[in-house]
């Protein structure tokens, strides 16, 4: 079916193949309820995450690059290893080669020196492990898919790595309510396939979906590409099972949409980055799968036109608008240079990706066509292409989703994940290009325009303290002046913990530290992360 677009668009229409249903990474899952990233599935992010040590120069140890001192935790002894082996026989990993990839973040910016990786399969095993670590004063680093951007998922020193990779079972799914209950180690992409087979979708979608775990998504309160339509995880997560620092299992794994009894304890752990407890299971509500998905990829002559295009789309598309992403021309050049992806439209200063999701293919296509005609005739858009076929939709989305991968191949990346007023979203990029000059290879901006989220990235040939000094605290102070947030969706982790004060008042920071001290008095859970050290 060819959509009835205006003549200037007709040559670029990508037409539908209604019978096509599988994404380009889909493979058969072993079993109905056991989920994980199966062998043979290509995930750019997973590939990068697990080749950083073998395929490139050794990453500098975190304490050698950052000013951080080891806290007085115990070190793992032979007796500790024997105790772990009793709890999870055959799943205590001490092989240095296997530990390498778990000690390094996928961006190759931080590296720990943990000597042991633990792979529990149940919440009870996690409880026994933490009970032992609590008594022995052993620091613990919870780890999911290790796709974090701020160094929160790898050890800083020699913390015990507690992996959720084998906790990958779907516990239940209700095909009327759409409520999914699963273990924390389920890979997001595999969960997406599981619920899609039942005519539902996950309420979040990330570029790292082929590797990231749902527990890590919740622990970092990940935003992603569906935030505009379905909101944050704070609204879609119904319940959690969490193991506290001393091994206590907190079972708040409710599947109720409404529960107004007492404090909503799960909210403490959403976005806590593993510092308050280890999430072991999640209850989440999944929206019905849209019957029709359309994507338009457009070129805009300036950022003012990007803003006006968003305003037009929001006004004319209403409830079917599910994503509105933007990127600058340097992003497009980098995905072409490093990933050989082809620009489907004429070269432009800015590009936007518009997605609609609804229940009527004809109705949605007509609405989107009217929008495209409007923005084209008004000069807001200079060129564009549209897709309704799932394969073509995935190809257009790849231009946006793989920007991070392209940047990682351009050199060392200084990454900033900021919330700003939409009208000021790109001003910081322009400002930094002038400020940094030739010291930076590229200064690029892209992100989720619909929720005011800028991903600001600066690449260089190698890590440079001079360049870091020019960026920080300048970026954070600039953001604070606009009453923005220094972390929109990536969290604070290790690298951003000391800038919390740019977004939160001292009273709020103190209260967070008191909460941490109450739930984890020995401070063994993900130390050196999320909160600034107390004086």
UniProtKB/Swiss-Prot annotation:
GO terms for molecular function: (R)-2-hydroxyglutarate dehydrogenase activity; FAD binding; zinc ion binding. Its cofactor is FAD. GO terms for cellular component: mitochondrion. It is found in: Mitochondrion. Its EC number is 1.1.99.39. (R)-lactate binds at residues 400, 490. It catalyses: (R)-2-hydroxyglutarate + A = 2-oxoglutarate + AH2; (R)-malate + A = oxaloacetate + AH2. Residues 1-50 form a transit peptide. (R)-malate binds at residues 400, 404, 415, 490. Keywords: FAD, Flavoprotein, Metal-binding, Mitochondrion, Oxidoreductase, Transit peptide, Zinc. Zn(2+) binds at residues 448, 455, 489. (R)-2-hydroxyglutarate binds at residues 400, 404, 415, 457, 490. The modification N6-succinyllysine is found at residue 115. It holds the Pfam family FAD-oxidase_C. One of its GO terms (biological process) is malate metabolic process. Belongs to the FAD-binding oxidoreductase/transferase type 4 family. This is D-2-hydroxyglutarate dehydrogenase, mitochondrial. It comes from Mus musculus (Mouse). The gene is D2hgdh.
